[in-house]
Amino acid sequence: MAREFSLENTRNIGIMAHIDAGKTTATERILYYTGRIHKIGETHEGASQMDWMEQEQERGITITSAATTAQWKGHRVNIIDTPGHVDFTVEVERSLRVLDGAVAVLDAQSGVEPQTETVWRQATTYGVPRIVFVNKMDKIGADFLYSVGTIHDRLQANAHPIQLPIGAEDEFNGIIDLVEECAYMYGNDLGTDIQRVEIPEEHKELAEEYRGKLIEAVAELDEEMMMKYLEGEEITVEELKAGIRKATTSVEFFPVICGSAFKNKGVQILLDAVIDYLPSPLDVPAIKGIVPDTDEEVERKSSDEEPFAALAFKIMTDPYVGKLTFFRVYSGVLNSGSYVKNSTKGKRERVGRILQMHANSREEISTVYAGDIAAAVGLKDTTTGDTLCDEKSLVILESMEFPEPVISVAIEPKSKADQDKMGTALSKLSEEDPTFRAHTDQETGQTIIAGMGELHLDIIVDRMRREFKVEANVGAPQVAYRETFRAAAKVEGKFARQSGGRGQFGHVWIEFEPNEEGKGFEFENKIVGGVVPREYIPAVGAGLEDALKNGVLAGYPVVDIKAALVDGSYHDVDSSEMAFKIAASMALKAAVSKCNPVILEPMMKVEVVIPEEYMGDIMGDVTSRRGRVEGMEARGNAQVVRAMVPLSEMFGYATSLRSNTQGRGTFSMVFDHYEEVPKSVSEEIIKKNKGE
């Protein structure tokens, strides 16, 4: 089957936003207008096409990024709908990694919200060009220019409107196109009756002002246009479009458009903007990778002629076909039934069938080309982040890094029958989601599951019940504390056991010192003159790593320290790897008294939105939870409190906020960093963990 759409007519985009900004509704409408859906599904009725897991339909939030293909004006648009809830940021990271562009959806009443900031940061990390769609222009309190202001203030982004709304709230009935200098008025509710008209007289002045600002902003990034602009020459529509496209694809400029997906306004114009301004696979830099054996850096260009290379970015268990592996093809062509190499794991895989996904219906295809996104059936060993490539031309594409879980709970099956199924369910779920971990606690024998937040773990337990028919009891949430050293010291670890027969002997001197935050554990060998033989040095590093996992104060993993092996001694007969491992762990224990160990706790960035009259109660509540208020602002007729609060104090906050504000307050939180625990709290944690 020949290629249906050329590479330059392909767009791989993600739709990203804060929870409730209307992202899924926007995707729905795109599918409706591109002819993929015959009846529109409303998210708040639980009928949306993209939210296809049962819980998503119940909770009205998107959990897994569904990938779907649509067509618009001779272009193929592959869309990934990403979740906006903070507990699912890993889904967003995964999809951004394989996209070429994104649409950031904002709520016209709130503008940029905390999760928008997180997602925006992630998109910046991956260098993803973005268009901003200010949605919900029909909502009470909608304010387009306020929303644009929040993009400047909170994201420090060079964003400029390329459209202006005509009216707002109930009066929102049209859009001014600043590029083409015209307006679009809507004649019916389905948004299919659009009249292109001249800009209404009463809006002309504002439109001219903002068109001038737009041209100036684009000209600043384009020398030729700048010259024309300074010389007072007219800049044509084509030149302006080309300038916006160039600046957007190089991630220097972000066009802002507006609409109301729910009221079917502005969606076709959003699709036009995706095609006009977001990059095709040819416009983004070639992906880099390394050759497995030589570590030589190579690049794969977006072309069908290059050897096949793709990245698996999502695993899903489908009730009908089993395991689905979603992948993005960067170069080359893949036919169903062929063999590929999983170069990350060094395994050969057979691609049984290739499916093109549409939310949760699917179409079988025989071939995928460079730039496509599809799902494969039949891959046994491939997990998220693995590279699939041509067996004759191996490459490992840069993989994805996932954050460590911050919260854990103990979980136990309700019956013996559930016990066996639970193991299978947990391993399948952790295969699908790299930020979800399950392990058995060595000391208590309990099964512990860990993830990115309470909602994340609720949904995992829910999925176990629905998809795997496993009933389980869940314990109280536990915070993922960490430990670290605040002072440097040189300590000795000596393990000598000579009691007849072959003894054990290992002796080390290790210098411990604090490392930079986020750098983890670093081990360095500074032995001179062979006082500790070369073959035992890895054992010292391994001994330390093992001992660090169980902490020095309260049994939490020790992070961000440096250890240098500086001296020691050995015995010709009695020394062994085991003895040096034990000596290293003894040195770590000895460091407790000298290195000033402290406990660290995860701090959450919290944003609470409340009616003004509850301000005092909420501020008091935040302070009582050891929170620091970092800022306040009025948003419409509500107050927004931004604070940094320890995760351990946020359990059950949703219930407390509801009762404090008669259900009128909302909050969102996202993990920010680790911070030292106050002494009184630290003592309590140590006592609790030692069972006192």
UniProtKB/Swiss-Prot annotation:
GO terms for biological process: ribosome disassembly. This is Elongation factor G. Belongs to the TRAFAC class translation factor GTPase superfamily. Classic translation factor GTPase family. EF-G/EF-2 subfamily. Pfam families: EFG_C (PF00679), EFG_III (PF14492), EFG_IV (PF03764), GTP_EFTU (PF00009), GTP_EFTU_D2 (PF03144). GO terms for molecular function: GTP binding; GTPase activity; translation elongation factor activity. Gene3D superfamilies: 3.30.230.10, 3.30.70.240, Elongation Factor G (Translational Gtpase), domain 3, P-loop containing nucleotide triphosphate hydrolases, Translation factors. SMART domains: EFG_C, EFG_IV. GTP binds at residues 17-24, 81-85, 135-138. Catalyzes the GTP-dependent ribosomal translocation step during translation elongation. During this step, the ribosome changes from the pre-translocational (PRE) to the post-translocational (POST) state as the newly formed A-site-bound peptidyl-tRNA and P-site-bound deacylated tRNA move to the P and E sites, respectively. Catalyzes the coordinated movement of the two tRNA molecules, the mRNA and conformational changes in the ribosome. It comes from the Bacteria. Residues 8-282 form the tr-type G domain. One of its GO terms (cellular component) is cytoplasm. Keywords: Cytoplasm, Elongation factor, GTP-binding, Nucleotide-binding, Protein biosynthesis. It is found in: Cytoplasm.
